[in-house]
């Protein structure tokens, strides 16, 4: 399906390109002159990429079906129709993959691959028009009275996009609820999630002007509260979490000490409980506070959220960085990490006020060199969090095994801390960490220190291109290596987590299955 050139979304072979286990996606080598930057230049050249000379039309289903060849390929995404013909040779998934979208509504196909891709920006010069909506029988008699839609200057505003179908809700008793109360100087909102909350938290709060958006990330489900507040409040939100009882309390300070008669006006999707994958991404502007070298080509970024925002990123979830490169929005997911693997005894940072991201800089990339060159104090749009990992997979696990390659280590970092802090039933956790050279190992000294402090934790480093002085394991992942690593003691419950470049992940998953681990005992981290 529609994808983006490999340098930016993300770099070829990075762990962010991994599909679910068993659903590998073929990549093709792009011809010279067909990178993302080349595509951006083409869209800025003034060349007619739609074949309509700037006209925007309304497209019927029958008309869409006619455009189903490589040289004449239209597709519909969220109600908007695009001509993909010019993009064929720029698509890293290849022509065959892109042709799956030819002549049809490809929204679901697109969402299967990378729903976070900003196709509106990438394909804005390929916009043919809007999909004609078939009136329902009940409305048929009234169509003559409706005003025709003007298509000049057509874009894809959120109001035109069909709302995704929500998944069946869990039993009513499990649906979160909220309440609120006030004092002379504060307004307090209490959310009862009706489940235990992990130590990492689950609340994402954004106060922008008078609008308050509160999202609870509860496993695969998202609970959203959204108001235009009755009166002004100060631009700071206190978030307190009672983890064991599943309660989250927000405290807002009133700008004027007066009694509120109501909390505010409900906004779009207020008090909804749907699957996370069906919830649209919400972006906020963050400030780059610091960049720290982790290795020769990897940096740890610290981003500060706006004063009115708090983000508790659940373990295994990623956020999206968005910035403009030559006038085109470029977006890429990154797994949130902690500031360090071993937490300091005291920290001055307020929980949820900062985000830390570990980013490998690809010299030929589009986004990562741009980020690496940003000055301290620069702004970056951050969306999410999002991801499929839930703590349910850790239930009753006694042996946790992690197979990571390169920056595929990032989701493992917080998983290790979570397991050590919150899951005493886990008797053993082992990380096998694959890299090319010793200088590529992320947080090597911290991993070694953790091994000495925590008898439950063990790390084995494997290098494919080691120096002669290297005394550790050598080579690439294979069956013999895993057979000795993935022990299955009597009366144990095991979980194997995998993350890394696509080739590594596919090999690891295949080898783990050959060792008779079930699908329930295997989790692949993916974007």
From Swiss-Prot:
Please give the GO cellular component terms listed in this UniProt entry.
cytoplasm; endoplasmic reticulum
Q: Domain Cytochrome b5 heme-binding spans what residues? A: 56-132
Reaction(s) catalysed by this chain's protein? 2 Fe(III)-[cytochrome b5] + NADH = 2 Fe(II)-[cytochrome b5] + NAD(+) + H(+)
The family assignment reads: Belongs to the flavoprotein pyridine nucleotide cytochrome reductase family.
Function as written in the Swiss-Prot or TrEMBL entry:
NADH-cytochrome b5 reductase involved in endoplasmic reticulum stress response pathway.
- Positions of region (Disordered): 1-24, 138-171
Whose protein is this, by species? Danio rerio (Zebrafish)
Q: Which gene encodes it?
A: cyb5r4
Report what the protein is called.
Answer: Cytochrome b5 reductase 4
One GO MF term on file is:
heme binding
Q: Which residues bind heme?
A: 91, 114
Q: Where in this chain does the record put each CS domain?
A: 173-264
């Amino acid at each position: 399906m529609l994808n983006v050139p490999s340098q930016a979304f993300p770099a070829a072979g990075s762990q962010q390109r991994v599909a679910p286990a068993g659903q590998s996606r073929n990549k093709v080598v792009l011809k010279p002159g067909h990178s993302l930057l080349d595509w951006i230049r083409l869209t800025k050249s003034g060349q007619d990429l739609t074949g309509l000379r700037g006209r925007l039309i309304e497209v019927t289903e029958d008309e869409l079906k006619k455009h189903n060849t490589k040289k004449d390929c239209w597709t519909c995404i969220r109600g908007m129709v695009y001509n993909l013909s010019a993009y064929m040779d720029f698509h890293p998934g290849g022509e065959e993959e892109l042709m799956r979208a030819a002549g049809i509504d490809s929204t679901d196909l697109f969402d299967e691959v990378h729903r976070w891709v900003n196709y509106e920006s990438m394909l804005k010069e390929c916009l043919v028009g809007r999909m004609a909506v078939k009136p329902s029988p009940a409305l048929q008699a009234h169509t003559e009275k409706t005003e025709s839609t003007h298509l000049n200057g057509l874009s894809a505003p959120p109001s035109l996009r069909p709302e995704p179908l929500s998944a069946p809700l869990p039993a009513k008793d499990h649906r979160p609820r909220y309440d609120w109360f006030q004092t002379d100087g504060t307004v307090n909102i209490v959310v009862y999630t009706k489940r235990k909350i992990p130590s990492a938290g689950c609340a994402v709060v954004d106060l922008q002007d008078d609008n308050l958006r509160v999202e609870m990330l509860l496993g695969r489900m998202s609970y959203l509260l959204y108001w235009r507040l009755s009166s002004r409040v100060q631009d700071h939100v206190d978030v307190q979490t009672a983890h064991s009882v599943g309660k989250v309390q927000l405290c807002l300070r009133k700008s004027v000490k007066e009694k509120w008669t109501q909390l505010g006006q409900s906004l779009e999707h207020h008090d909804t409980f749907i699957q996370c994958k069906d919830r649209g991404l919400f972006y906020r502007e963050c400030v780059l506070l610091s960049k720290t070298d982790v290795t020769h080509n990897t940096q740890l970024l610290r981003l500060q959220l706006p004063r009115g925002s708090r983000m508790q990123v659940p373990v295994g979830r990623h956020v999206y960085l968005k910035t403009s490169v030559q006038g085109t929005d470029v977006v890429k997911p990154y797994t949130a990490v902690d500031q360090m693997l071993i937490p300091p005894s005291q920290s001055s940072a307020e929980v949820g006020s900062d985000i830390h991201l570990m980013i490998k800089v690809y010299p030929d990339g589009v986004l990562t060199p741009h980020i690496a060159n940003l000055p301290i104090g620069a702004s970056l749009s951050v969306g999410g969090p999002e991801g499929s990992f839930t703590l349910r997979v850790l239930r009753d696990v006694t042996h946790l095994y992690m197979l990571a390659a390169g920056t595929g280590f990032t989701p493992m970092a917080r998983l290790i801390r979570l397991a050590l802090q919150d899951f005493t039933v886990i008797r053993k956790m082992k990380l096998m960490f694959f890299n090319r050279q010793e200088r590529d190992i992320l947080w090597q000294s911290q991993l070694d220190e953790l091994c000495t402090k925590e008898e439950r934790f063990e790390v084995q480093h494997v290098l494919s291109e080691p120096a002669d002085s290297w005394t550790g394991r050598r080579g690439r992942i294979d069956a013999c290596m895993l057979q000795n690593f993935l022990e299955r003691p009597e009366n144990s419950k095991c979980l194997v987590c995998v993350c890394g470049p696509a080739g590594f992940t596919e090999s690891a998953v295949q080898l783990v299955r050959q060792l008779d681990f079930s699908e329930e005992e295997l989790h692949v981290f993916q974007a």
